[in-house]
Amino acid sequence: MAKQVRSYSELSPNPSYELMYEEYLDDIRSSGIILRHKKSGARVAVMSNDDSNKLFCAAFRTPPTNSTGVPHIIEHSVLNGSKHFPSRDPFMQLVKGSLNTFLNAMTYGDKTLYPVA
């Protein structure tokens, strides 16, 4: 059974982030914490409970400026390696060498997600 974090103070707060909101959610028996990265403004949502299954998801706003599909092309490009990360297909390397139960990438009309469980 995983240890549940009940409050932000239990996390050894990182000075690069500020606490925006914190609440215990009775209906799902989870603690919810929202942080903001001070320099970039990126928000981090942390849900903690005693479930042994874990999830991480990087999500980005990718509002379209036209109908060329650039956000979807970028989604696939991110998963094809680069000069500094020369794996031809790092996504498939993660699938083969991981204990994950879910690994994917998806583009919606206004956002792109990279979930891992």
Predicted regions and their residues:
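N- or domain-start disorder-to-order transition segments that initiate the globular core
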Residues: 1-51
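M16/MPP (pitrilysin/insulinase) zinc-metallopeptidase core fold and M16-derived inactive scaffolds
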Residues: 30, 48-117
